[in-house]
Structures are given as C-alpha cells and as structure tokens.
C-alpha cells in the first residue's frame, strides 16, 4: 500500500505572566500542534486512540485523511508522542504517554473495532486495555491532546478516549465512538443515518431522531434503531458520560492549514 503523508510540528509557548514580587513568574502554558495527511484504500478504517483529550471527526472535503493533534499543558510536549501506524487494515493514530511499567508497555495496536476492556486512572498513572489487546500502563502528566480528524466518506472511523469527548460531525460512513469519562456527540442527517446502537453505563442518551430508549436499571440508558435508509452502523458508547444524537446541516469547517499542496514523508519543526 502506498502512503503519501506529511507530519509537521509547530510549538507555541505562552509568555509567562508577572504575578508579584515574591512569585514573579508563573509557569508558561505550552501548545504544540502536529499535522498529518495521507491516503489509504477505500473500505479501510481510520482509528484514533486518545487518553486525555477530545477526538472530533469531520467529513473531509477531498480524498485524503487529515489529522490535527494539539497538545496543551505545562510539561514538555515531547513527553507525549503522536504515533501514526500504517497497516493492511488502514491507519491507527495514538497519543502515547510514557510507560509506567516495563511489563506492560504501551502498544498502539491496530484494531477493526471495539472499545475498552479496562480503563482506570489515578493522579499519576493510567491502565488502558482495548478490546484488541492494545494499550498499556502509562504515566500521566498535565498534557492533554485534542484531535481533529477529517475522514473521506469511503473510509470507516473509530474514535476512543478515556478523559474527553468523542464527536462525529456529518460523517457518511460506519462510525464507532467510545469514551470512558466523557460524552459522545454525533451530528447526522436522515440521508446520512443508519443503524444506531448507543449505550451509556451511567449517563443518558438523547436523540433528535426517533429511537427506542431503554433504561438500564436506573443507572444508564440504551438507545437503538434505524435513522433513514443508509446501510451503515453507528456504535456509540460511554461509561460515565452522556450520548447526544443531533440533526445537522451540511457544512465544512474552514481549513486550518494554508491549503498548500504537500507530498512526501518528512518532519517539519517550527519552534
């Protein structure tokens, strides 16, 4: 499989503020942005695995995948890597925090679907196991990573995060969205509908479309049904958050890049 891609990184450091004479300088907030774009064959999957931060998927204007990952925090951005793994089933993207246990190193392992087998966090560590066996034990810091993914309609999408929201805006393909502590939001039209299965273990499910709703013993909610006639599947799941399905109008967000054509595998760093 041929992959044409670019990975560019830019860092912005906020100016430290002067507070008082006894504590003259507060820590500087650091923001670093990583961009990637490339092409994979039709019918494959684009999946994003995050730990601390949001994942938002949008329909791409063109035929390439576009990825924007923004790190924010006071720690060194190099402590969290953005891994892009090309494989025969598609593309897997992970926010990779430092390993906490050499016996369980983090594995950005590709999958074909599914959520979390295990996801637990403390103040300093997280234990993550996906259904496919990937994940690991990692050290947490104050860095969060927010992803925006633009996906061509010919590709499937899977988004996962622990502490953050997962949202899909007017995607026209199969979608899986999994969060542990955050919400799941999906905007779609009747024409872009499909078979919906939404489950919140401790929260609620709200829908602007007619779906069958079932309470899970007063501690969660399940919603299922079909929207329109599209032959696609939307699997939405959260543990502690809510799920929202809303009617959306076709619109594209303004491109965040300068629109210049880019080809080849390379790193561009601007600090």
Where are the language model's segments positioned?
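Short, surface-exposed interaction patches in beta-rich subdomains
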Residues: 26-41, 68-70, 77, 96, ...
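Gly/Pro-rich, low-complexity intrinsically disordered segments
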Residues: 2-8, 13-34, 106-140, 248-271
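Short beta-turn/strand-loop junction motif enriched in small, turn-promoting residues
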Residues: 53-54, 164-165, 182-184
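Right-handed parallel beta-helix
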Residues: 35-41, 45, 83-174, 222-237, ...
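N-terminal, post-signal-peptide region of Sec/Tat-exported proteins
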Residues: 49-83
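N-terminal segments that cap or nucleate solenoid repeat domains
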Residues: 24-56, 60, 162
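Short strand-connecting beta-turns/loops that link adjacent beta-strands
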Residues: 60-62, 87, 191-192
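Short beta-strand/loop motifs in extracellular/secreted proteins, especially
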Residues: 44, 53, 65, 155, ...
């Amino acid at each position: 499989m041929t992959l044409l891609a670019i990975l560019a990184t830019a860092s912005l450091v906020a100016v430290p503020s002067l507070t008082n004479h006894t504590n003259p300088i507060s820590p500087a907030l650091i923001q670093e942005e990583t961009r990637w774009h490339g092409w994979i064959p039709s019918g494959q999957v684009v999946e994003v695995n995050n730990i601390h931060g949001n994942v938002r998927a949008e329909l791409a204007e063109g035929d390439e995948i576009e990825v924007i990952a923004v790190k924010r925090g006071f720690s060194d951005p190099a402590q969290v890597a953005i891994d892009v793994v090309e494989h025969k089933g598609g593309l897997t993207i992970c926010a990779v925090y430092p390993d906490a246990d050499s016996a369980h190193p983090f594995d950005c392992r590709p999958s074909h679907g599914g959520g979390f087998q295990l996801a637990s966090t403390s103040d300093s560590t997280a234990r993550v196991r996906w259904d496919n066996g990937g994940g690991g034990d990692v050290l947490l810091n104050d860095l969060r990573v927010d992803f925006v993914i633009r996906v061509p309609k010919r590709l499937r999408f899977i988004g996962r995060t622990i502490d953050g929201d997962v949202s899909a805006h007017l995607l026209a393909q199969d979608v899986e969205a999994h969060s542990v502590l955050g919400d799941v939001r999906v905007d779609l039209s009747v024409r872009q509908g499909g078979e919906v299965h939404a489950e919140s273990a401790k929260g609620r499910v709200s829908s602007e479309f007619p779906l069958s709703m079932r309470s899970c013993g007063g501690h969660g909610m399940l919603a299922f049904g079909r929207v329109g006639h599209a032959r696609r599947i939307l699997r939405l799941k959260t543990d502690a958050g809510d799920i929202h399905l809303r009617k959306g109008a076709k619109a594209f967000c303004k491109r965040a890049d300068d629109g210049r054509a880019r080809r080849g595998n390379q790193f561009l760093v601007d600090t």
